[in-house]
Design a protein with these regions (language model features):
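N-terminal secretory signal peptides that target proteins for export/translocation
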Residues: 1-11
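Bacterial N-terminal signal peptides
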Residues: 11-26
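Compact, glycine-rich, soluble single-domain proteins
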Residues: 30-165
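Absolute protein N-terminus
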Residues: 1, 28-29
Length: 165
């Protein structure tokens, strides 16, 4: 057993790729609801003096042949959750607006990240979100139904992307 640990330690020191894989696996978590896969729900730590926050999914995927939509989310850490998108308007200004759902076409993948595209706005936080904290969130999909996920508060997310994949 001791030689196995020595081998693994040596492999980690020699291979940045192995180290990156192990680090990414440490952050990985998610849920599945029918054909919907929710990969790594996360939120960013609160900025000082703010009462709102944001949550994201490193990956939201519809593996099925039927379209679905995320239509609602709730969490005990905020008064309400709004589904939002960000886009540049005709004047070249980035604007955030509430939307009535996040569409998932068959076999679609959506990646969310701070400052780009879609996110879940946590309105009226009951206390600031601190790095490393976890909180529950219930997601409701138009077809697939409801699922409870755990959101992890992190400053940086390995492998996070933005927009539809």
């Amino acid at each position: 057993m001791k030689s196995l640990f020595a081998f693994l330690a040596a492999a980690l020191r020699r291979s940045p790729l192995v180290l990156a894989f192990v680090a990414a696996a440490a952050f990985a978590h998610g849920s599945t609801l029918g054909d919907i896969e929710i990969g790594h729900p996360y939120a960013t730590p609160s900025l000082p003096g703010t009462s709102n926050g944001a949550a994201y999914f490193a990956m939201l995927e519809n593996t099925g042949n039927t379209a679905d939509r995320l239509v609602r989310a709730t969490t005990p850490v905020a008064a309400r959750v709004e589904l939002h998108t960000m886009a540049v308007d005709a004047q070249g200004v980035m604007r955030m607006r509430e939307i009535d759902g996040i569409a998932l076409a068959p076999h679609a993948k959506i990646r969310m990240r701070p400052g780009m595209g879609m996110h879940l706005m946590l309105v009226g936080l009951k206390e600031p979100l601190k790095d490393g904290a976890r909180f529950p969130m219930r997601l409701e999909f138009e077809r697939a139904g409801k699922v409870d996920v755990t959101v992890i508060v992190r400053s940086a997310i390995p492998g996070g992307g933005g927009g539809a994949a």
